[in-house]
Amino acid sequence: MGGHHKKNLRAEKAKVKLKGAKLPKGLNVTKTDFKVRKIEIREQLKESSYSETGQRQFNLKETLSRLKHHSVKFRTDAQRNVRDSLKSGNADHLIGHLNELFQGIAAGALDMERSARQESFKTLDVLLEALQPQAVAPFFHVIATYLRCAMTHVLPAIQEDSLLMLDVLLLRVPPAFLAERSASTIIGNFIDMISRARHDNERSNRTLTLNLSQGKQTTVKWRTKVLIRLQQILGTLVTSKTASTGAARVVHFEEMRPQYYNVLCPVRQDNRDLHTILNESKLTAEGTQLHTYVEQLLPLLQDNWMEVRPQQQQPLLNQDAAASLHVVIGLMSLLWNLIEQHEADHSTTELSDWLRKNYAQKFLLNFLAKDGSRFPYQQMPLATKKSSKEKGTVDGGELCMPQNLGIVRLTCKFFPSPVERQTQLFAHLVGYMQESLNRLHSLSPEQQLSLVASMRALLFENATSLMKIVAEPLTSLLSASIEAYVSQRFTTREGVATRVLNLLCEIVERSDLYTRFGGEQRFTPFLSYLPQLVLKPTVGESTLRAMTTLCRHLNTVFMAALLQSAPEIINHLDKLQITNDIEGQDKFENQKRVLNLYYYARVLDKEGKLERLVKQLEEQVERKRIADYLKAVVGYH
């Protein structure tokens, strides 16, 4: 210890000796004459840029790594950078990294933070909008997997936000693509979101769930939210199976060129399987899946309606009940559409027969009552006024027009051959349709489309059986429809007037319906009005086709009206345009289609009106082509 003490003293003494001394000049200057080389890692350390708001913009690899970062702020910044890059038109450089990009963005659907989930959905929306469906196809299973995980998550908040992710897919992904990839799986997840499997001896295999932590009203709204998205998914299935009819092959005769026509008719293929041909009960895989959908969904839909349905003494619906009825009726209609498409493809009626046998009476009791006393439904006036657009899309408005018209169509599907004891029920439905026609001027184009669809169900599809029990009300409805069409009360938007025209023409073409409804006496106003359509600036392809069919059937009322308007029609041919015609078709070819109508109408020309018209046209040099063709049509034997 003593030695150490002396050593410390000497050290202290040495410090004292140096105190006040100065270093020689130049020894305290930093040397700067050495050389250095800059270290560069080109792939990792790129120059960072800043946006106009002063936020840092990262390179692609840094962004992809930050999408998986544990910090919410880092993940949110990465999502924002991806959106900014896509909006600036730099989507091409992402093509090679789409797998990592979709993994990172779709994983945000399971994030515990709500803000991060919403940022993820915004980024997914921008990304799907920027990419072509072909580029998304190899990675769509990644998005669908995270969507299904979110829909079945244990946290209600993540389940609820999964509907926002589905909204993005419904908006940005083509319906056929979405239906083909994962619609069937998503439908199962939808059912799990509002119900659970039942483990008792009840006939129904699922029961509705109630979220006790949020109250009954919130549960009703939650189910409505889920069912609206389910309706959109089923709509994609219906749309994807709707076949588009191609244009027919048109061959024009020319004397100086060889003509080639089909000699043999195409062989009609029987697409039925062996079980259907032998009348054995055997569903295909698609039919079995559809059977499962209906078996699980219909009881849930009816139970959901029974929970919010008002008592018999209070027929008015509150807003939640009206919205619930709106989506329930829409879903049931879509299920019927899927069944009809399946049965048309496979030439069978097994599913529809099973559906009517098991659910027709339940539908009648729950939605109409046996005598139709619960129908029609109306909504209570709202205390606070909302925009008409919001009311119309959510609950159908105070008159509940979409719901009531949907119930009319569903009743016709469940009871295609009504019996005499249902006379009061169907008279009630027809009376409601008559009242709706009287309010036609106040209906939107969408409501008029729904009205025409319900008219088709009553006046055409089920008319043969309905004429046996409600002949007089149904005939009055037809007369009101003809009067509304002739007076041009149906809007031309969304093709409403054209659909009414097609419906009336199809009724005329059916000889049994034409006779039962009163024949010429009933349809004279409509048939006499038809030639006036050719005097308008445009005429639809379907309208011209319907006129041709009426001429082929030698309908004398229509041909007489056509002959009477011949001078005006032929003088108007140069200004006439046919909509939805074959692309690139010559204008004269369309004019010839109108002139061909007089090949049939000439049999009523006892006064030689057409021949005088031909002579007048021959005097006009610029119309010689029309005159020659009309002369050939009139003189052809």
Give the positions of each predicted feature:
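Alpha-solenoid helical repeat architecture
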Residues: L67-K73, G108-M112, A150-V154, I194, ...
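N-terminal "cap/leader" segments of large eukaryotic alpha-helical scaffolds
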Residues: M1-R83
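Boundary/linker elements of alpha-helical solenoid repeat scaffolds
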Residues: K35-Y50, Q79-D92, F121-P133, D167-A176, ...
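HEAT/HEAT-like alpha-solenoid repeats
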Residues: T53-L64, G89-A109, Q134-A150, P175-R198, ...
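Long alpha-helical repeat scaffolds
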Residues: R309-H637
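Hydrophobic residues within the alpha-helices of tandem HEAT/HEAT-like
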Residues: L67, N81-G89, G108-A109, S120-L131, ...
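Alpha-helical repeat/alpha-solenoid scaffolds of the HEAT/ARM/MIF4G superfamily
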Residues: A179-A322
